[in-house]
Amino acid sequence: MLRSAATFPLLRVFTLTLVVLGCGCAGTGPGTGAPVHYRFFDPPDSNDIWTPTIRGWQSRERALTDTELLRPTEASLGARVSEGGGATIGSGGTHGDLRAEYFAFRAERKRALARDVAAWIQSEARHHYIPNGPIARWATLEETLANNGASCNGLELLPNRFLLDAGFRPDEVYRAIVMRPSDGQHHMVTLWFENPDDPWVIDPTGAMTTGMPHLSEVAGWVPVKVFSEYVEYTVHPDTVAPGSLAIRQAR
């Protein structure tokens, strides 16, 4: 088939374009195509130009001993934030105070993660719950995983340890023994003290509650002990504020 003379320049341009594009894609990265390896943790040289700036920031950042010291007041956070709402948006669709928005977002994400953990362990418990024998021996996390399950004493360690591994503070996440006064039944749950007076409850098996309610929302059970790997507290009714837990003073 014959082509007109005008067709050949167009074909040449089209062909050159494909070649250029093809070379551009294939030519990214090192010439050999081999992956680049880095040593990420070498000490800086004595004359490194970044060192003074980095060390100046490190010194100022270490002066803040606890991020919670930056937390705004509940009044500035607003009712939506304290009840689990999102960031506050000002008039005209503009965002409000960055400090309030940061802590509101952080609280919202932590609650969402904790609720996911509660839903997950309550689902897994249906397949991995192993009743206690004649003598109850509390399993460690290692033993619970090795045995592919445990009673509430072992299963509770999974959400508890997950929250700690995910960055929740060790002074806000505790194991707790709860008791049902109607029949003396005891149970193990995780308490997350986002609110020091009314913690969230994560029940691994659903024997006490499902989801992640506040302790004040769970009827028929009372906390007896609060503890971790390193500390142990006994829970008493707070005579200063009836109905709240007397644990803040013991920390």
PLM regions and their residue ranges:
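Bacterial N-terminal signal peptides that target proteins for export
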Residues: 1-14
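Bacterial N-terminal signal peptides
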Residues: 12-23
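Secreted/extracellular small peptides and ectodomain modules produced from precursors
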Residues: 1-2, 21-23, 150
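A structural boundary/capping signal
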Residues: 25-251
